[in-house]
Amino acid sequence: MELKVVTNSEFLPDLMDVVRAFSPLVAIDENEQKNIVYIEIDNDTVALKFNQKTIENRCEIQNLPPIKQKSELKRLAKIMLYDLLAECTGKRLPYGSLTGIRPTKLYHELTESGKDAKNYFKEYLRVPQQGADWIERICDNQKGIYSHNDKQVDFFVNIPICVSRCSYCSFISAELGKIKKWLAPYVGQVVREIKHSVALVEILGVQVRSIYVGGGTPTSLCEKDFEQIIAELGKIKCKEFTVEAGRPDTISKEKLKIMSDNGVTRISINPQTFNDKTLALIGRNHTKQDIFKVYDMAREFDFDINMDLIAMLPNESFEDFKYSVDQAIALNPENITIHTLAIKKGSNLKLQEYDNKIELLPEKMIEYSRNAIISNGFEPYYMYRQKYMSGNLENTGYAKQNKACIYNIDIMEETHSIIACGAGAISKRVWSEQNRLERLANPKGIDVYLEREEKILADKENFFK
């Protein structure tokens, strides 16, 4: 079914997200003349018109601030469009009318406001029982870590560099061989920005709760450059220090020792798959044996280890994915994260027009991973969703008891301010009592980042003061 949506509101992009979630059963066609959905908003009323039928619903927003009124009207418009498409296609989506990244954040907010969040998700947002149960379980598992504290901050350092580009990746990451002339200046500037941020922490009188070094692949750096950044961060006192070591072909014993000597508590070793044919296909320059070798080497140190896998990688069958899940479980890391492939703009898979919407396969893969991982002593502790995901499902992080990642919970629930360093890094300032946050983004390109050092430091200082 081809469809066109017309609205008098500013919510068209959000409404398009609902339509895309029903792909391939529904497709957007701006030239469509027959199947046109009109969504009109007039004060507190949302009207949906389709095939000479009109449905109107009022939104109780009179006593809400303007930004909240807008949010509630948008939510109602999405629900009404979802109901129409569900009726036309006979399909119900795993998370109902929800299209946002952070369903657990909304669940927490509703609970904290005194509402029955689970009932709201099921009855109003049209989330099926299984989806509502899953969100509730994750929120319950965050107890003891989930908190609001404006006197604590997280640190994030971005190393947007990789040895090569994976076919599914859309991050603004540079290939190591193409930016060698900028490496030393970049490392130096990141170290200076970290020092500036530590001074800012002291001025603000706050504590650092966790540190997360991501990218890209931070371990793409040589040992000398890598140590400069990790050693500077190692001077900071915090509860948790994670490095996204990532690709096995970038991890050496010396880098593991650098991390251990400087207080890193948690690393990621990310296979994505344990199938050699897929590793080659997606542009990973290592084999499954390399994964095993690096994992055993990392176990000589006292790190908690996370392993990422991706469901619906190109040409992978259910049995291929099952094999990867079983291999990860057998290695017995503290965390396993299951991503559902999202075809993102800027990725090679998007350019190749790879189809990740094979009927029922994503659901089968994710259901298996849930059951297998949980039955082996893990619990889901955070989740997030993205556009263009296979099966409109989710990414879920699992942890053994008392091994959940603080930073992952903080960033997904947006409960703590984040001081971010490096090209493309985004700082966040959270005002818990006002339920408000603001963002400050560093320039994405390494070259631009290097050109604007003084402005970056000044902007950050003004942002947090």
List PLM regions with ranges.
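Radical SAM enzyme core and accessory elements
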Residues: 1-105, 109-113, 117, 397, ...
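Short beta-strand motif preference
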Residues: 46-48, 157, 269
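N-terminal [4Fe-4S]-dependent radical SAM core
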Residues: 88-95, 112-156, 204
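Canonical Radical SAM [4Fe-4S] cluster-binding loop centered on the CxxxCxxC motif
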Residues: 150-187
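Beta-sheet entry/capping signal
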Residues: 152-154, 210, 240, 335, ...
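Conserved non-cysteine loop/helix-boundary elements of the Radical SAM core domain that shape
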Residues: 173-368
